[in-house]
Amino acid sequence: MEHVSKRSIGQFFKRKTSTVDGSKSQKCGTTNQLRKLLHKRRVQKQAVPVESQYRIPGDFRDNQSVRVKNSMYNSSPSVTPSTHHINERYVRYDINTRPLVVVLAISIVFFGCLLVLKDIIIQSSENILSVSKWKIIGASFMGTPYTGLLTGLVGPLLSPFSAVSSWLSFIF
């Protein structure tokens, strides 16, 4: 009796896909790996002129001189080096978005706390204003609509400054 190999749960649920040409199965990979497989299996049938193989990068010539040299060696016109296809490299730029998400989450929590603190700041400013009005103007002024008006004017003026200063202290 043959020994059956034990497979872990992770190996059991691994997804298998067929290769690009469908000949055999392979594990799932990134698109870069698939591009590299395509690149390796591609047969290059393009004729590369001998002159273009030894060209120095940055050595620019006009197409007329290239055609004249090619016509001297070959009777038929050939492909100029300017139309010669260079093998591409597939470069994947990975952008690490985790710091951006962390900063965004912290700023959302921070502004949420500011919304909660805004009510506390307004209540404390109302208390401060009412006490100062009672001391300066007198008790007859308390309870009138002017108290709410004054608090409504002073509260929004003070809260943006506190929000900006606390945000700047958080950053620096």
Swiss-Prot record:
**How does this protein lie in the membrane?**
Multi-pass membrane protein
Q: Which residues lie on this side of the membrane: Lumenal?
A: 1-101, 165-172
- Keyword set, alphabetical order: Endoplasmic reticulum, Membrane, Transmembrane, Transmembrane helix
Record bears the keyword Oxidoreductase: no
What ranges are annotated Cytoplasmic (topological domains)?
123-145
CC per GO annotation:
endoplasmic reticulum; endoplasmic reticulum membrane; nucleus
Q: State the compartments where it is located.
A: Endoplasmic reticulum membrane
Q: Where are the transmembrane segments?
A: 102-122, 146-164
Misc: Present with 704 molecules/cell in log phase SD medium.
Q: Kindly provide the name given to this protein in its UniProt entry.
A: Uncharacterized endoplasmic reticulum membrane protein YNL046W
Instruction: Specify the species.
Output: Saccharomyces cerevisiae (strain ATCC 204508 / S288c)
